[in-house]
């Protein structure tokens, strides 16, 4: 347009065309003036030129004046600074000796220099005679690995992170808001429990500490709850870690127990230190209450960052997909990894690394019930939960602790819409007097129940042995998997050949006097039985869906999970099951 007429502004700003006689200085002056007046970027074109002769950028910074900050605001900022300094300096000075960060420094590690996006309840207990910074408990929201999360963090410099009235109120509000937003919750725990001298008003009240665990229960399966322990969590404080979906302890600093060593000695006479009572080794190898142990605070954050890659924000969403990568090891080697001898051990991790995306297997509870592997992985970028028998431990037989571990993992995956991959190579549930005392039937029931109830897509692979009720627990044909496929090394039967022949033919074999003849007949019977349980026979009877070449297993699983991605399964109409 000629003579200073203006073209309509668009999202990129305003374009102005002036007469051809104007020079660059005039164009620049016009651009600056119009950008200031219109509060938008301006391009000025001279004559018929295609390129602007000058541009003006709008200055949208606030107009400076002399109205602030006031003394009132400066006083408030000073008060906030004092609160954020935490408890007494002497307690802060002790933290490095224990390998710990001050809680607000910890938040910077997790969320960057600005820490929390916003904080709630910072002034809790500000007016108390004995001022307690934020009542020793920080709550708010933050962005973590690109996601909005609710956050709770104890301040150990304030009464050793203990809990009392105002802090309890903050904790409860944070949980209740998580139910509304559907965002994950991070609990950064470092608490010695409830303040015994202040228990009136927060212990047994309707809105007291007991409500924590009510809210934990309501949040369970709704949004991921992740807990990291940075210190001793005793009594009531120890329940948050076990209610969380995932719990990480930090080596050398964290512990959890229903009572302190002093209380244990008073009640039972047992003299025990905190680490032996409830340290990381106890809870990752014996109780199963913790999933992982971090080397230090930085490692704890890294582990949680890895973990959330496999999880959705809530139960209404699917877990996020990532770009696919080839497996760490070649699928061509799968058949060579699985021994010809069905009784020879091998590492199932080697099979997993040849099936899932490169370096994507994230194992949980590796030291607890190690005869079953549980963990997340990506398969063609799709998150899956892996439940795999581990022949390198206890021949892959399922013991009570492993059954409980697998049940909990399957239940969690189903809650958060993570498909399940079962890799079966087990002689079945372990037998004997000790496992009966350890509740093998009860805990085996839980594993079978969790597998039965899962409505996410499931794929079962018979890698080698699938004996007894092991094939039930590992989502065999009767448990509504989308597919049951087998490798040529697979066998499906009530029991293995050795046990079966001994059970059925022991008396007849004993009647053969010649030892060589008896051994020969026993071997013949074993071979006949082995043919009966061979997966080709099972495929012939359409017990399983397919026998696949091992080198194609990854491709088979990628295609099957993709095809059944949107499968819908209904549970019978009922309030809930009775298995817990």
PLM regions and their residue ranges:
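Well-ordered, non-membrane alpha-helical segments in soluble/globular domains
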Residues: 27-30, 443-444
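Short, glycine-rich nucleotide/cofactor-binding loops
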Residues: 19-24, 396-398
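Polar/charged, Gly/Pro-rich intrinsically disordered segments
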Residues: 2-6, 11, 21-22, 29-42, ...
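Ligand-binding clefts of soluble mixed alpha/beta catalytic domains
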Residues: 39, 51-580
């Amino acid at each position: 347009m000629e003579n200073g007429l203006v073209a309509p502004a668009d999202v990129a700003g305003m374009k102005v065309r002036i007469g051809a006689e104007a020079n660059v200085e005039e164009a620049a002056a016009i651009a600056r003036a119009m950008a200031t007046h219109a509060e938008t970027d301006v391009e000025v074109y001279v004559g018929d030129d295609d390129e602007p002769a000058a541009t003006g950028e709008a200055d949208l910074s606030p107009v400076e004046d002399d109205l602030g900050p006031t003394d009132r605001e400066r006083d408030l900022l000073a008060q906030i600074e004092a609160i954020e300094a935490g408890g007494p300096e002497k307690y802060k000075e002790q933290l490095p000796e224990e390998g710990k960060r001050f809680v607000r420094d910890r938040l910077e590690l997790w969320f960057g220099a600005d820490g929390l996006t916003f904080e709630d309840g910072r002034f809790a207990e500000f007016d108390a005679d004995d001022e307690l910074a934020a009542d020793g408990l920080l709550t708010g929201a933050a962005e973590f690995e690109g996601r909005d999360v609710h956050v709770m963090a104890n301040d150990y410099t304030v009464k050793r992170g203990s809990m009392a009235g105002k802090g309890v109120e903050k904790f409860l509000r944070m949980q209740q808001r998580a139910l509304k937003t559907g965002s994950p919750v991070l609990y950064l725990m470092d608490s010695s429990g409830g303040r015994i001298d202040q228990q009136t008003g927060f212990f047994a009240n309707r809105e007291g500490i007991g409500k924590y665990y009510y809210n934990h229960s309501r949040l369970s399966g709704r949004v991921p709850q992740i807990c990291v322990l940075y210190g001793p969590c005793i009594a009531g404080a120890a329940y948050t870690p076990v209610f969380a979906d995932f719990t990480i302890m930090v080596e050398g600093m964290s512990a959890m127990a229903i009572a302190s060593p002093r209380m244990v000695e008073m009640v039972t006479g047992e003299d025990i230190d905190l680490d032996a009572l409830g340290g990381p080794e106890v809870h990752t190898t014996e109780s199963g209450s913790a999933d992982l142990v971090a080397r230090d605070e930085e490692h704890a954050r890294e582990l949680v960052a890895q973990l959330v890659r496999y999880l959705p924000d809530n139960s209404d969403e699917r877990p996020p997909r990532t770009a696919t990568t080839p497996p760490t090891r070649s699928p061509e080697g799968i058949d060579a990894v699985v021994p010809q001898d069905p009784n020879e051990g091998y590492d199932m991790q080697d099979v997993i690394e040849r099936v899932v995306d490169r370096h994507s297997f994230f194992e949980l509870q590796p030291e607890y019930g190690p005869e079953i592997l549980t963990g997340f992985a990506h398969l063609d970028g799709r998150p899956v939960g892996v439940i795999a028998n581990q022949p390198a431990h206890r021949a892959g037989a399922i013991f009570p602790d492993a059954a409980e571990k697998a049940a909990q993992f399957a239940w969690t995956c189903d809650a958060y819409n993570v498909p399940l991959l079962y890799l079966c190579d087990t002689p079945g549930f372990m037998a004997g007097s000790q496992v009966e005392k350890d509740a093998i039937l009860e805990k085996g029931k839980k594993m079978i129940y969790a597998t039965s109830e899962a409505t996410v897509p499931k794929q079962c692979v018979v890698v080698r042995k699938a004996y007894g009720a092991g094939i039930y627990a590992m989502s065999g044909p009767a448990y509504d998997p989308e597919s049951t496929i087998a490798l040529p090394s697979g066998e499906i039967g009530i029991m293995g050949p050795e046990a079966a022949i001994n059970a059925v033919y022991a008396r007849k074999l004993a009647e053969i006097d010649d030892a060589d003849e008896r051994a020969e007949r026993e071997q013949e019977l074993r071979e006949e039985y082995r043919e009966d349980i061979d997966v080709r026979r099972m495929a012939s009877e359409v017990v399983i869906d397919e026998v696949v070449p091992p080198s194609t297993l990854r491709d088979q699983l990628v295609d099957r999970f993709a095809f059944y991605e949107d499968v819908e399964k209904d549970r019978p109409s009922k309030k809930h099951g009775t298995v817990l």
